[in-house]
Design a protein with these regions (language model features):
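Polytopic transmembrane helical bundles with strong interfacial aromatic enrichment
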Residues: 1-140
């Protein structure tokens, strides 16, 4: 479930990034995928609290690391806007408002595209980790 939802988000996000298109559906799917990661972590915690453990300790690394990946990806997403502003030598987001309308749209499109790429990549990493977790989930 975790791998499937995040794979769908990664594919849609990658496609939209490639085509330089915004996608409300991607963000919704990404958030659902992130929610599935949280739900999976809660299930793992509940099983551990109940005394049921995987015989392979790598399982816990692969199963819980997606939470950290999501956090780091969100930080990179936040930083992506500042990177674009720095590239254009703009001091802050308000300075974009002083640009001609066409340039404003270009800056916003670059920021959205970078954010989309970062988050689609993070979803792809989560897919890999979820599949590895599934492969190491022994002994429950």
């Amino acid at each position: 479930m975790v791998a499937g939802l995040n794979a769908a988000a990664a594919l849609l996000g990658g496609w939209r990034w490639y085509r330089c298109e915004e996608s409300g559906a991607f963000w919704l799917l990404l958030r659902v995928g992130q929610g599935s990661v949280l739900a999976f972590a809660l299930v793992i915690g509940s099983l551990a609290a109940a005394g049921k453990y995987s015989s392979d300790n790598l399982f816990y690394l692969y199963a819980l690391l997606p939470l950290a990946i999501g956090f780091v990806a969100e930080q990179l997403r936040v930083g992506s806007a500042q990177t674009i502003l720095d590239q254009r030598e703009l001091p802050d987001a308000q300075a974009v408002g002083g640009l001609p309308e066409k340039e404003q749209r270009t800056v916003v499109a670059e920021i959205v595209r970078r954010e989309l790429g970062v988050m689609a990549t993070s979803a792809l990493v989560v897919v890999f980790l979820a599949l590895r977790a599934a492969g190491t989930a022994h002994g429950f």
